[in-house]
Amino acid sequence: KEKEVVVIIGPSGSGKSTILRCLNHLEVPSGGKITIDGIVLEEGANLNAIRREVGMVFQRFNLFPNMSVLENIMLAPMQVRGKTKEEAKAKAMALLKRVGLENKADSMPDELSGGQQQRVAIARALAMNPQVLLFDEPTSALDPEMVKEVLDVMKSLAREGMTMVVVTHEMGFAKEVGDRVLFVDKGVILEEASPEEFFTNPKNQRTKDFLSKIL
């Protein structure tokens, strides 16, 4: 739903990231249909049109190492949205300010910490004005002291009404920000509930076992 934050949790190797990657056909589902905004997602002309509206933030940032921070953010709006260099730069600088990194515009990715790189990756995704943002374990590759700076940006986006699907092991984020929580194991969604119900009164025994080990 629009402005909803859906959090997907589960053990490692359970298929959480695969679900996320199927939402924009980075991986092709072996069966069934995925419908986004009333459009069935399939190979063809509509796939790229839908991908333009779906931003993705990866576990390991995936910034282009040969481009500056500013160039990383400007690239897609210019090549895909047809923005002028001036328009793309103005948008990129505004987004860098939003994530607290306007002083890093001319830096190269390898000059940044992991937390800073992930905030740049979020700004890059936002530069396309997506209708929904997908986050694939955005904090799992970060040092513990850098996790908060990324989660703070994500919480801010949620407060502003960004529609988000988040695969994460950050249970505090799921409780605080999520509107719905999905529990996935062995490629199957075993449980779906509000955060309050999910964490205080899970129904599925596998969910109970999982939560008992991590909380």
Where are these regions (language model features)?
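C-terminal boundary and immediately downstream tail of ABC-type ATPase nucleotide-binding domains
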Residues: 185-186, 190-192, 196-215
